[in-house]
Each structure stands twice: as structure tokens, then as C-alpha cells.
């Protein structure tokens, strides 16, 4: 009798994805982040579901309902902080996952990569809407500032913003629809993840050398299941240390003040994981130009397959590109720092320099370095 694992219509899908999946034997810990992102998504959906049971999406009671969750619901404080800090862990894993893809040339799998970029956009939209829900000062003003950016779109901008708001300012209608979208989007993300995996398993995983590894593959289970479990334990440990010892470390104190449309906070800024994009937005004096730069700073990821000039896939044997990659990483850290600073000298100049460097490295310097490395191969 054949094994049910290999014959049952449903179980065999799981088998081909997580058990008998042929996997390159040399993939490093950088390949752990895919499974960690899956774990983060599950944590966020579960904690979010329990929070939604007690949350009310009304401007009068939203802030109080979050307070009620933290004070009166059994382990409500724990669920709330796991959800808030889980988002931070999600983005840490996300950025490392994307960085791994850039470093090792995983973007040559077009479909997998492009679905991944769409996933990144969707997750960013979900996180932004989730940040609005507690209805604190930074929630309200963050929502006002970011949605207002759409007014930069010529001709239809103002109408579009009022349509999204459901009125003439961020109010009850906005909060209700943001809650609805924040609830539904994680399930759309889960569906997109399935498509992401579907395309990945069409080609098989990349590996650190960037070479074809068909002759040297091992089954996913037990080798990589145990490796993923180790990663999951480390992620859970980090998350719980954050939640139980300093749950507000990555948050904004302004969000413990109920939203007040009559009082603007001195420095409006988003959560830390959006600061790099916010810095790029701020560094351009023109509103429409800033919005375009903001969108393009993420959309530029879709250009990587076109900009790939090297005859080698990854950067493992390309020291010049490696150097540029780490300069780009340092530049993103600089942008993140600048995004959290007030808009004044010298931060404006640093932000503008870092923004120009970001686009220049990706669009001009990296492709040129790749072409130079191709020439050096002939020596």
C-alpha cells in the first residue's frame, strides 16, 4: 500500500511543499527568513483575531477599547503587545529576506520576486492601517499626513483623499474602513504567500553559490525542518524578550494620548519600519516629487532583474558588488535614523544626500560595477 502522505490529494500538496521538497544542501541561515515570515503572519493573524473580539472601531471608543484590552481582558496586555511588537519582528524578517534576495540574486526568479514585492506593498499598507486603529495622537496625525499625500495626484487628488477619508477629515468613517481593511488584508496576504510559494517551487530554491544545485539536493524534512524550528525558537525568544521587558521600546509615547484633531504633535513620524521611506519623502521639497520618490523607493525592487548585468548570479564571488551592497545597507540605516529626526539643518542635507545615494547606487553604480566585474573575469 502506498503512503497516504504521497497519494492523498490534500496531504500530498503539503508533502511536496514541506517534506519531500528537494532543497539545495548548502543554503545558509539567510534562507530561514521565509519560514519565519510565515510564523510571523500566523502570530499576527491569531493575536489580531483575539484583539478584534474586544476592539471597537468608533472614534469615541477606539482608544478606550484598547485601554480596556490592556487592563481588563485576560492577558489582553500580552496579546496587544505581541501584536504590536510582532509587526516589528515581521518587518525585520521582511527586510532581511529581501536583502538576502538582493545579495544572492534570487530576483532572477521573476514571478516569485514580483509577487514578493506585491506582498511587501500589501504588508506595508496593512501595517499602516493597523497603526491608525488605537486612535492615539500619532495614529490620527499619521493617518492624516500619509493619506493627504494622495492629494498630490494631479486633477483627482483632492477628490481621492476625501473619498478615502469618507468625509472632509480623518474621522469615524476612516477608522471603520481602516479596521475593515486591516482585518481582511492579512488573509489576502496569506493567499499571496501561497502563490509566492507556488512560483518558488516551480524553479526550486536559489543557494549561496548561485549555481544550479540539482545534482546536490536533500529532502526538506528532517534537515531544514529542524533548522527552521531553531530559527522559530530564536524569533519567539526575541519577540517575548521585547514584549515582556520593553514592550514600548519601538512605539511612540504620543500614541498614549487620545487623538486630538486640534493639537498637532511636534514631530509626526510613522513606525520605525517606515522611517527610511519617510526620510526619502521628506528630502524632496516638492509634494508630488516626494510622493513619487516614496513609491519608487519600494517599486525600484521590481527593476533589479532588469538592472542585473553580471554574468554571475549572486554576489558571493563579486567583492565590488558586495562592497556596494553594504554601502546601500548602511545608507538605509542612515535614512531610517534621519526619518525619525526633526526636519531641520543638518538632518535635511543628510537625508537628501542619503536619498540621492540610495537611487544612484541601485540605478547606476551597481550595474556599472557588475559590468566592470564581467571585464575582470577575462583577466
Curated annotation (Swiss-Prot):
Heme b b562 binds at residues 83, 182. It is found in: Mitochondrion inner membrane. The keyword Nucleotide-binding does not apply. GO terms for molecular function: metal ion binding; ubiquinol-cytochrome-c reductase activity. This is Cytochrome b. GO terms for cellular component: mitochondrial inner membrane; respiratory chain complex III. Belongs to the cytochrome b family. Heme b b566 binds at residues 97, 196. The lineage of its organism: Eukaryota, Metazoa, Chordata, Craniata, Vertebrata. Component of the ubiquinol-cytochrome c reductase complex (complex III or cytochrome b-c1 complex) that is part of the mitochondrial respiratory chain. The b-c1 complex mediates electron transfer from ubiquinol to cytochrome c. Contributes to the generation of a proton gradient across the mitochondrial membrane that is then used for ATP synthesis. One of its GO terms (biological process) is mitochondrial electron transport, ubiquinol to cytochrome c. It comes from Petaurista yunanensis (Yunnan giant flying squirrel). The cytochrome bc1 complex contains 11 subunits: 3 respiratory subunits (MT-CYB, CYC1 and UQCRFS1), 2 core proteins (UQCRC1 and UQCRC2) and 6 low-molecular weight proteins (UQCRH/QCR6, UQCRB/QCR7, UQCRQ/QCR8, UQCR10/QCR9, UQCR11/QCR10 and a cleavage product of UQCRFS1). This cytochrome bc1 complex then forms a dimer. Heme 1 (or BL or b562) is low-potential and absorbs at about 562 nm, and heme 2 (or BH or b566) is high-potential and absorbs at about 566 nm. The keyword Transmembrane applies. A ubiquinone binds at residue 201. Keywords: Electron transport, Heme, Iron, Membrane, Metal-binding, Mitochondrion, Mitochondrion inner membrane, Respiratory chain, Transmembrane, Transmembrane helix, Transport, Ubiquinone.
